[in-house]
Amino acid sequence: MNPWINANVLKVHKWTQNLFSLILNAEIAPFQAGQFTKLALNEENINFSNNVKKKKIQRAYSFVNAPSNKNLEIYIVRILNGKLSNLLYNLKSGDNLFIKEKSFGFFTLDEIPNCKTLWMFATGTGIGPYCSILQEYKNINRFKNIILIHAVRYQNELTYLPLMKQLYKSYNGKLKIETIVSREKNHNSLYGRIPLLLQNQILEKKIGLKINRNDSHVMLCGNPAMVKDTYLFLQKDRCMQKNLRRKHGHITMENYW
């Protein structure tokens, strides 16, 4: 059983017109960094006719916070005409919603085999699981290098860059961070898209490390097109294989939407 339980909204942080974070308080079961949950509201929050049976509108969202943090943080993109995301965007401090008691998913460090360099690629809100993992500081000393890469459309969408910089300092040289923007040029970020920046080797040259099957593991999270294209490139160009629970590989993936 995995029942819905109540969550109380402590804060809604609206980063842009389309990006926001919910800070929640809820008595959920312990979860692992990198896992996701489900949030829901009843359809009665919208003006439906009385003859329509009311049900929960639910969506899956990843945690940004470390499991040891008592406040839950969820990073969300507001979808045009999206039923739930627009309702969540308009919540206020003190409002309530539903959250699943138990969390889901295997996008966790326990599923990652030992390696020298762990690459974490994210687009958009896919940065969330990595923030959770890196803030927890567990099962992470076995990696010599951790590379965190966040790709967005515009520079102002790098909403968790201050946290990334704090983590960079706290890891004392183990963690490297890089940002990418695809729809404008900014001297603080690489310009382009992840698959192309791997194909032309610009990204690896900037980092100073090369992805290879002998000492690297790659985590991909976010836009399904990025995940697919990056996976296919690594599979073909670097002879890397998908990581499975029954058979360890070199690439661990999680699609958003």
UniProtKB/Swiss-Prot annotation:
GO terms for cellular component: cytoplasm
Positions that bind NADP(+): 152-153, 182-183, 193, 223-225, 229
Enzyme class: oxidoreductase
Cofactor(s) the record lists: FAD
Keywords tagged on the record: Cytoplasm, FAD, Flavoprotein, NADP, Nucleotide-binding, Oxidoreductase
Pfam families membership: FAD_binding_6, NAD_binding_1
Catalysis: reaction(s): 2 reduced [2Fe-2S]-[ferredoxin] + NADP(+) + H(+) = 2 oxidized [2Fe-2S]-[ferredoxin] + NADPH; reduced [flavodoxin] + NADP(+) = oxidized [flavodoxin] + NADPH + 2 H(+)
InterPro entries found in the cross-reference section: Cbr1-like_FAD-bd_dom, FAD-bd_FR_type, FNR_bac, FNR_nucleotide-bd, FNR_type-1, OxRdtase_FAD/NAD-bd, Riboflavin_synthase-like_b-brl
FAD-binding FR-type domain ranges (all copies): 2-110
Role noted for this protein: Transports electrons between flavodoxin or ferredoxin and NADPH.
Family: Belongs to the ferredoxin--NADP reductase type 1 family.
Protein name: Flavodoxin/ferredoxin--NADP reductase
Organism this protein belongs to: Buchnera aphidicola subsp. Schizaphis graminum (strain Sg)
